[in-house]
Regions:
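Catalytic metal- and UDP-sugar-binding loop of GT-A-like glycosyltransferases, i.e.
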Residues: 4-6
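Catalytic-site signature of metal-activated, phosphate-bearing donor transferases
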Residues: 2, 11-175
Length: 176
């Protein structure tokens, strides 16, 4: 079972190599390297710089947890492959902002519906700390700065996503 999101592309060359991977019946699933692009620039660093994601699995060995940003649960051995997926998630900053907002609201709704307990103090502390730490981690420690404007945009907007998740959680727990 090969599955890609609508904004992911597997090259013809990589597609031709899939049967070779499937020959090893001991492996239940494979992680493929995902390379993100923003403004036609390949992101080599930051949060998306070294991303491998399960995109090839035997249908009898996989199930999913969560509806949005689903997490594959694999029964059996998972290995890394050399295959690469190109990921074009955002056409421009406006598209990126809309996506960040939508996913933040979905994530907060998921956490709220799963009945995680979030005391007010925890949400406020995370609101103040987590987005800032995430920016520093992605932009400086993971070298997002080396990706230029695209790296800065990603670091800022993914930190903003972290902020929005907590703002939406605060609204759900304490303002409704």
């Amino acid at each position: 079972l090969m599955f890609l999101d609508s904004d992911e592309i597997l090259s013809q060359q990589n597609l031709k190599q899939l049967p070779t991977l499937l020959e090893n019946e001991a492996v239940s699933a494979y992680r493929l390297k995902r390379v993100d692009y923003f403004h036609q620039k390949k992101l080599r660093f930051g949060e998306t710089g070294n991303c491998s994601i399960i995109r090839l699995a035997r249908s009898n060995a996989i199930r999913y947890q969560r509806v949005v940003h689903e997490i594959p649960i694999i029964a059996g051995q998972v290995e890394n492959s050399h295959l690469e997926i190109r990921h074009y998630p955002h056409h421009n900053l406006n598209d990126f902002l809309n996506t960040v907002n939508n996913y933040a609201e979905l994530e907060a709704s998921y956490r709220f519906s799963e009945k995680y307990f979030y005391p007010k103090l925890k949400i406020i502390l995370e609101l103040l700390i987590y987005p800032n730490v995430k920016f520093l981690l992605n932009y400086f420690l993971k070298l997002g700065i080396a990706d230029g404007f695209a790296g800065l945009a990603y670091a800022v907007l993914m930190s903003f996503h972290s902020l929005l998740v907590r703002v939406y959680l605060y609204e759900k727990y304490f303002l409704n």
